UniProtKB/Swiss-Prot annotation:
ATP binds at residues 230-238, 368-373, 455, 470, 566. This is Acyl-coenzyme A synthetase ACSM5, mitochondrial. Its EC number is 6.2.1.2. GO terms for biological process: acyl-CoA metabolic process; fatty acid biosynthetic process. It comes from Homo sapiens. Pfam families: AMP-binding, AMP-binding_C. The modification N6-acetyllysine is found at K97, K152, K303. Detected in kidney and liver. It is found in: Mitochondrion matrix. Its main location: mitochondrion. GO terms for cellular component: mitochondrial matrix; mitochondrion. PANTHER family: ACYL-COENZYME A SYNTHETASE, ACYL-COENZYME A SYNTHETASE ACSM5, MITOCHONDRIAL. GO terms for molecular function: ATP binding; fatty acid ligase activity; fatty-acyl-CoA synthase activity; GTP binding; medium-chain fatty acid-CoA ligase activity; metal ion binding.
Length: 579
């Protein structure tokens, strides 16, 4: 254990008798809070980041010791349900035991070495959290991905990241097999299944036989932890690399302040495992000793979510605004949420009327936050702070967030500009390391003393930020970031498409959706528009991830262009949004 942490834990275990009641049972102690306060001080930038840090060793194993000493309520650390009666509960001790076994699978049968990269493409199964922790224990860099990735998406990610291993489920294994021969770095394929598949190692079988003894890798704080692919407006998705500390410690403050978590809380975030919000949940909840609740939730179903909130003692809920829009359309008076005390949302703009309807029908406020794959939480409405409906909240420590013009000059309150985070003279440790293998994109994201988020907003005189839109053309539909070039490239593969432009279009449920303006080739100009629309939509679903398909299609004779011939998506977007 690191020297800076050993002192705190030994103090906790040494002093446990002093806090025992007359029956010798541990009473509520301040000691775990002292440990959390140390992590929080680092997260807030008030204490230096240690040279060495490993989340599994320095956080999870510490909570396991505190749990064993009786310094934590009897909540599980992890609680998974599938909606048909199956449940899995792990204490921190059991999580440690199972993750050490998983670490032996990665380092043994998979042959992974510290620094090697592994893709995790799994639905909401317990193995995702188990393997994530195992990656930390072995120094393996994890690369999460959504289960909707197509063969083309998987090939690009495996080739670009040079991942040596992938773990996935039965439904995606055929897609991986179809492209694995074109991915020379890929050495092992790990299957989470109760059945076998030729050419694949069965994770569950290997886990059953693995040893519980494992020495955690001694990682440096700046060593890579995770890579996330994020969509952009030009070309292929970028690789965002985060370090052991940027995620491992960077989310502690938001977990304590915005999510308001304690060791008594049970936290359910409905996010997909492939998105950064899954990592945010892990790194927010477990440092605070909280329980992560997971429902397998094969598809979003408002009634399933509401019934789950009624059945289980969930105290804290986080959903994207799209889901809250669906929930408030139900008759919420039919449900009783006896344990629910705190609700959060982020990933896209929240309509004020949704927040008001939710609060009116449940009595629970909705607290909005804002961040990116490149950062941790940038702005938020912490619990207890006055909420201004429609605002993203105030800057979250340790960030100095400003609104700047296109030259990087700070703008006064009330003026719209670029959302920027100060990175000089000191770069916040919770920032991403870089866009991997892309120094040009990394440099382009900075301007003077600031990192430019690519989003536009204004800040009022009280320091609240109000989202105005994106500088780029990325479409944010139900919190899925979709690059227009990816959709346009998919459309271009169909013989009916001469050229296309893809922009966002307003939608009452999803906030915004993909709309494609298409100029047809002469051979298809007389085709039935409705039938052709359906054909093109199905084509995009086959070529790229299904969530990227254009829900709206307009056939036009020409597209607006600049003098140099570049398509002006901004004009089409303004037309859609009435600006």
């Amino acid at each position: 254990m690191r020297p800076w942490l050993r002192h705190l834990v030994l103090q906790a275990l040494r002093n446990s008798r002093a806090f025992c009641g007359s029956h010798g049972k541990p009473a509520p102690l301040p000691v775990p809070q002292k440990i959390v306060a140390t992590w929080e001080a680092i997260s807030l930038g008030r204490q230096l980041v240690p040279e060495y840090f490993n989340f599994a060793h320095d956080v999870l194993d510490v909570w396991s010791r505190l749990e064993e000493a009786g310094h934590r309520p009897p909540n599980p650390a992890f609680w998974w349900v599938n909606g048909t009666g199956a449940e899995i509960k792990w204490s921190f001790e059991e999580l440690g035991k199972q993750s050490r076994k998983a670490a032996n699978v990665l380092g043994g049968a998979c042959g992974l070495q510290p620094g090697d990269r592994m893709m995790l493409v799994l639905p909401r199964l317990p193995e995702w959290w188990l393997v994530s922790v195992a990656c930390m224990r072995t120094g393996t860099v994890m690369i999460p991905g959504v289960t909707q990735l197509t063969e083309k998406d998987l090939k690009y990610r495996l080739q670009a990241s040079r991942a040596k291993s992938i773990i996935t489920s039965d439904s995606l294994a055929p897609r991986v097999d179809a492209i694995s021969a074109e991915c020379p770095s890929l050495q092992t394929k790990l299957l989470v299944s109760d059945s076998s598949r030729p050419g694949w190692l069965n994770f569950r079988e290997l886990l059953r036989e693995a040893s519980t003894e494992h020495n955690c890798m001694r990682t440096k704080s700046r060593d890579p932890l995770a890579i996330y692919f994020t969509s952009g407006t030009t070309g292929a998705p970028k690789m965002v690399e985060h370090s052991q500390s940027s995620y491992g410690l960077g989310f502690v403050a938001s977990g304590r302040r915005w999510v308001a978590l304690t060791e008594s809380d049970i936290f359910w975030n409905t996010t997909d495992t492939g998105w950064v919000k899954a990592a945010w949940t892990l790194f927010s909840a477990w440092p605070n000793g909280s329980c992560i609740f997971v429902h397998e939730l094969p598809r979003v179903d408002a009634k399933v979510i509401l019934n789950t909130l009624s059945k289980f003692p969930i105290t804290t809920l986080c959903c994207v605004p799209t889901i809250f829009r669906l929930l408030v359309q139900e008759d919420l008076t039919r449900y009783q949420f006896q344990s629910l005390r705190h609700c959060l949302t982020g990933g896209e703009a929240l309509n004020p009327d949704v927040r008001e309807k939710w609060k009116h029908q449940t009595g629970v406020e909705l607290y909005e936050g804002y961040g990116q794959s490149e950062t941790v939480v940038i702005c938020a409405n912490p619990k207890g702070m006055k909420i201004k409906s429609g605002s993203m909240g105030k800057a979250s420590p340790p960030y100095d967030v400003q609104i700047v013009d296109d030259e990087g000059n700070v703008l006064p309150p009330g003026e719209e500009g670029n959302v920027a985070v100060r990175i000089r003279p000191t770069r916040p440790f919770c920032f991403f390391n870089c866009y991997l293998d892309n120094p040009e994109k990394t440099a382009a994201s900075e301007q003077g003393d600031f990192y430019i988020t690519g989003d536009r907003a204004r800040m009022d005189k009280d320091g609240y930020f109000w989202f105005m839109g994106r500088n780029d053309d990325v479409i944010n539909s139900s919190s899925y970031r979709i690059g227009p070039v990816e959709v346009e490239s998919a459309l271009a593969e169909h013989p009916a498409v001469l050229e296309s432009a893809v922009v966002s279009s307003p939608d009452p449920i999803r906030g915004e959706v993909v709309k494609a303006f298409i100029v047809l080739t002469p051979a298809y100009s007389s085709h039935d528009p409705e039938a052709l629309t359906r054909e093109l939509q199905e084509h995009v679903k086959r070529v790229t991830a299904p969530y990227k398909y254009p829900r709206k299609v307009a056939f036009v004779s020409e597209l607006p262009k600049t003098v140099s011939g570049k398509i002006q998506r901004s004009k089409l977007r303004s037309q859609e949004w009435g600006k």
